[in-house]
Curated annotation (Swiss-Prot):
GO terms for cellular component: chromatin; nucleoplasm; nucleus; PCNA complex; PCNA-p21 complex. Keywords: DNA replication, DNA-binding, Isopeptide bond, Nucleus, Ubl conjugation. It is found in: Nucleus. GO terms for molecular function: chromatin binding; DNA binding; DNA polymerase processivity factor activity; enzyme binding. The lineage of its organism: Eukaryota, Metazoa, Chordata, Craniata, Vertebrata. This is Proliferating cell nuclear antigen.
């Protein structure tokens, strides 16, 4: 049997909002250590990896490993029925073909329960190699979302150039071009407002803005975002989920002088 209770149910709502536009269905792997999900998007360009550790839940029980095929759009629709303050409990029997979702109002005066049909999914797990990155940029997540949104009005790809003193985002299009440069902040009162750069060697890579704008749907999950880059390997865009885990997106760089991203 599986049962997980989350007093801060809004976290789960935000996770689904961050996933549903990029991937339509995915296998949730439930185990004693927590919940994980790994999936390519439908066009096989980007990869999503989610970890929610068991200790981040208020109660968590998973007697044996379960692979649960979920239509993310359906789950998102059901979670929209939960209030932001609601306590959310997920429950499934070992060989169940449904997932129960229970929403309790904080005052205990209203309890809603839903059952969602599960899917049979044939999923191949991709190994994600551990990697040292040439540049790691940590910045406010809302700032990154704004940059991606603004530059997508200019062009459909962004060049991210990372050097010791700052990181530059550039786009070219029919109307002209745009450049946004962020300098490393030296002293900021609030850590989440800082821009920090760890650089082993400078990097300049091009990425499709369409996908970055999908990734920034995760902005409400975390005040900061971390971008990890190296030549010829996928960019990692990571949002920490406080006390629980993380949501990571991987996107391969576009090869220069080619129309199609590889």
């Amino acid at each position: 049997m599986f049962e997980a209770r989350l007093v801060q149910g809004s976290v789960l709502k935000r996770v689904l909002e961050a996933l549903k536009d990029l991937i339509t269905e995915a296998c949730w792997d439930l185990g004693s250590g927590g919940i994980s999900l790994q999936s390519m998007d439908s066009s096989h360009v980007s990869l999503v990896q989610l970890t929610l550790r068991s200790e981040g839940f208020d109660t968590y029980r998973c007697d044996r490993n379960i692979a649960m095929g979920v239509n993310l759009n359906s789950m998102s629709k059901i979670l929209k029925c939960a209030g932001n303050e609601d306590i959310i409990t997920l429950r499934a029997e070992d060989n169940a073909d449904t997932l129960a979702l229970v929403f309790e109002a904080p005052n205990q005066e209203k309890v809603s329960d839903y059952e969602m049909k599960l899917m049979d999914l044939d999923v191949e797990q991709l190994g994600i190699p551990e990697q040292e990155y040439s540049c790691v940029v940590k910045m406010p997540s809302a700032e990154f979302a704004r940059i991606c949104r603004d530059l997508s009005h200019i062009g459909d790809a962004v060049v991210i150039s990372c050097a010791k003193d700052g990181v530059k985002f550039s786009a070219n299009g029919e109307l002209g071009n745009g450049n946004i440069k962020l300098s490393q902040t030296s002293n900021v009162d609030k850590e989440e407002e800082a821009v920090t750069i760890e650089m082993n060697e400078p990097v300049q890579l091009t990425f499709a803005l369409r996908y970055l704008n999908f990734f920034t749907k995760a902005t409400p999950l975390s005040p900061t975002v971390t971008l990890s880059m190296s030549a010829d390997v996928p960019l990692v865009v990571e949002y920490k989920i406080a006390d629980m885990g993380h949501l990571k997106y991987y996107l391969a760089p576009k090869i220069e002088d080619q129309q199609e991203g590889s």
